[in-house]
A protein has these predicted regions:
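Positively charged, amphipathic and often flexible ligand-engagement surfaces
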Residues: 1-468
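A general alpha-helix detector
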Residues: 7-11, 28, 524-527, 545-546, ...
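Structural signal for hydrophobic packing residues in well-ordered secondary-structure cores
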Residues: 29-36, 137, 169, 173-176, ...
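Catalytic cores of nucleotide-enabled group-transfer and carboxylate-activating enzymes in metabolic
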Residues: 111-131, 136-146, 153, 217, ...
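Hydrophobic alpha-helix feature that most strongly marks membrane-spanning transmembrane helices
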Residues: 223, 254, 284, 336-340, ...
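Terminal low-complexity tails and localization/encapsulation signals of metabolic enzymes
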Residues: 399, 403-406, 410-544, 548, ...
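Conserved coil-to-alpha-helix start sites within the AMP-binding
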Residues: 644-648
Length: 648
């Protein structure tokens, strides 16, 4: 029943992310925390709230908090959106209300974010979090503390997070709290990107030395105080790097025989199950238990967008929520199997009642634990602990209000999403039968396993093919491509004027006319090739030739010109490796930047080829009733000077 739902749950239910108003509130709340001055904040409120239909939500909720919020939103949104006729009747009053309501809404939004912060964050400091968590520990629950904050951008950021994590380990290790019930010892979760400003595959050598040393210091203290450590999962491109780092530290004498150094695996990743198999083999070889938190995944929206922008052939994650749910159960079944028991200690993190029940049914032992987020799944896990007598650990973020935003937005997206189990659970309009459907049945009910509403990255543009990209952060893909590029690195390229379709480079180089050697900017000892520079005679000949060819080219159909651009795009993609090698050697670009440059050139060609429809002739009716045909004509010969930093 809605009346029993906490006020934040009621607000999220009424303004869910499948409504325009819910999306507006999310955008507004997210943006307001970034705006330092009141005037700009009020202008944003005035702009955003005037376009929504707040009246339709009035009295839909039984929550006084929600209805009061709706009245405030109506006051700001509707007054700003009044027509000129309505404004004329009481313009002065309306202006007064407008000025009053924007600051009120601003303060209310900031206060709402703080209220939601208390819902999802256990404390501003580790000491406050431990104090606030005592009531749950008295009930038998335990915690995994994590310090709020996103990726470090500087060494100073990384040093700050290092001190925060060290302080958390010290506090947890020295905690003298004794539970009246059997509450397992708390642990600490660590986000690797917070500990190094260059936690990326391109800087693998630095990560496996500098970040490894930093993490080793934290682990050393954790082992001394016997505080379990879990490495958080992050973006798909960092998966292999995180596994290399984990393996390097896991095989050291520092953690040998400890069995409390673990990590997080995300089930929405198509590589999740193979990674579990690899970790199981690693644990068998080393002989030490690996605690492993299995989650659904936290970066789905970003992974989809990044893959589309990068032009990958496919996505690293499943595109249907039902597929992720099935993958989670498949991973859970593997983790509970006899071949894994004793090697990996499963920690199942989920707020889906069906998932929790399925795990309880499929297991034949109790060597695992459940996990949930602070502020979510309270009633579910109160029941689970009582019904299954299984330990439950609460993932509890710790930090100040200013560090809350990114984490809070992820939680609101999870809670507010229309497909979220948590969202549907508190929605009285959702039939119970829908909540209890098996995810396998739900997945098989679709015609395709992939989500047809999410096109593959190559087909993301409706009017043209996306340019092809290479994921150089995935070893299996990067190794093959880098080998292709290496095959061209010793090439000696030549360049020179091309006049009337004929290259003069070879003849000019033989005659040593205006020839210069080209060397790599990153190492002048590397000779890339030779270039023969044009003189004034060449320039004149080129302009004369282009001018002579202009009439024929101008008469050429737009379709033929567009086909030439498409052909050029295809040829550049076919020769991607060599073009990347040239960009790398001649301009000193990284492989990643070189791939991006080729992709941009390809996309330009395809984009302008598709503009052909806009260049066709069209009819115009004159004032005399006569029909006239309007057409576009070429303007003549142009000189184009390409930018030095984008040579392709």
């Amino acid at each position: 029943d809605k009346t029993s739902i906490q006020m934040i749950d009621a607000l999220l239910l009424e303004y869910s992310l499948d409504t325009q108003e819910g999306i507006l509130l999310m955008c507004l709340a997210e943006a307001l925390m970034r705006i330092p001055d009141s005037a700009t904040a009020d202008a944003l409120i005035r702009d955003k709230l005037s376009v929504a239909d707040w009246k339709s939500h009035l009295k839909n909720s039984d929550s006084v908090f929600v209805n009061a919020s709706t009245w405030g939103l109506m006051l700001t949104g509707k007054v700003v959106g009044l027509s000129s006729n309505e404004q004329s009747a009481g313009q002065a009053v309306n202006r007064l209300v407008n000025k009053l309501s924007e600051p009120v809404i601003r303060k209310a939004m900031h206060q709402a974010m703080k209220v939601m912060g208390h819902q999802f964050v256990l404390g501003r400091s580790i000491a406050e979090a431990q104090k606030n968590g005592k009531s749950m520990r008295d009930k038998g629950f335990t915690y995994s503390y994590d310090m709020l904050g996103e990726a470090a951008l500087t060494t100073a950021d990384a040093n700050k997070y290092f001190k925060d994590y060290l302080m958390a380990i010290e506090a947890v290790g020295r905690d003298t709290y004794v539970s009246s019930k059997s509450s397992p010892a708390p642990s600490v979760s660590i986000k690797l990107s917070a500990l190094h400003p260059r936690y990326e595959v391109a800087n693998e050598d630095r990560v496996l030395t500098e970040l490894c040393d930093t993490l080793e210091q934290l682990l050393r203290r954790a082992v001394e105080l016997d505080v379990a450590i879990t490495i958080d999962a992050e973006e798909a491109d960092r998966l292999e790097l995180s596994l290399k780092l984990f393996e390097k530290l896991y095989r050291t004498d520092l953690v040998k025989g400890w069995g409390k150094f673990g990590l997080v695996i995300q089930a929405y990743s198509k590589r999740a199950l193979p990674v579990l198999v690899w970790l199981n083999r690693l644990a068998k070889e080393q002989g030490d238990l690996i605690p492993l938190r299995l989650v659904k995944g936290a970066y789905w929206d970003s992974e989809i967008k990044w893959s589309q922008q990068a032009g990958f052939t496919d996505y690293p994650v499943y595109t249907r929520k039902e597929a992720t749910d099935v993958a989670y159960l498949a991973c859970a079944r593997y983790l509970l199997s006899p071949s894994v028991r004793g090697n990996i200690f499963p920690q199942f993190a989920s707020h889906n009642a069906h998932t929790v029940s399925a795990i309880a049914v499929m297991t034949e032992h109790k060597d695992f634990e459940f996990q949930r987020l602070h502020g979510m799944g309270d009633s579910l896990y109160n029941h689970a602990m009582e019904a299954y007598q299984q330990s439950v650990r609460i993932y509890a973020p710790v930090g100040s209000h200013k560090d809350l935003l990114p984490y809070l937005v992820r939680r609101l997206l999870e809670n507010g999403a229309n497909s979220s189990f948590v969202h549907r659970l508190v929605d009285a309009r959702c039939p119970v039968a829908e909540l209890t459907q098996h995810p396998v049945d739900m997945l098989l009910a679709f015609d395709t396993l992939h989500n047809t509403k999410i096109p593959l990255p190559p087909a993301v543009f409706p009017e043209r093919k996306n340019s092809y990209g290479v994921n150089i952060d995935i070893e299996s893909e990067a190794h093959q491509f880098e080998e292709q590029v290496k095959g061209f690195l010793n090439n000696q390229w030549t360049a020179g004027p091309v006049i009337n379709g004929e290259s003069l480079a070879e003849s000019m180089i033989k005659a040593d006319q205006n020839v210069e050697q080209v060397t790599a900017p990153y190492d002048r000892r590397i000779n890339v090739g030779q270039v023969a520079f044009a003189n004034l005679d060449h320039v004149s000949a080129a302009i004369t030739g282009a001018d002579a060819a202009f009439a024929d080219w101008n008469a050429t159909s737009v379709e033929t010109k567009a086909a030439a651009l498409d052909k050029l795009a295809d040829l550049m993609e076919d020769n991607l490796a060599e073009l990347v090698a040239i960009c790398h050697q001649e301009a000193g670009k990284t492989i990643h930047d070189s791939v991006d440059e080729v992709r941009e050139a390809v996309d330009f060609c395809r984009y302008y080829a598709k503009q052909a429809d806009n260049l066709q002739g069209f009819e115009l009716k004159g004032f005399d009733g006569q029909t006239r045909i309007a057409s576009r004509q070429g303007r003549g010969v142009f000189v184009c000077i390409s930018p030095w930093n984008f040579p392709l």
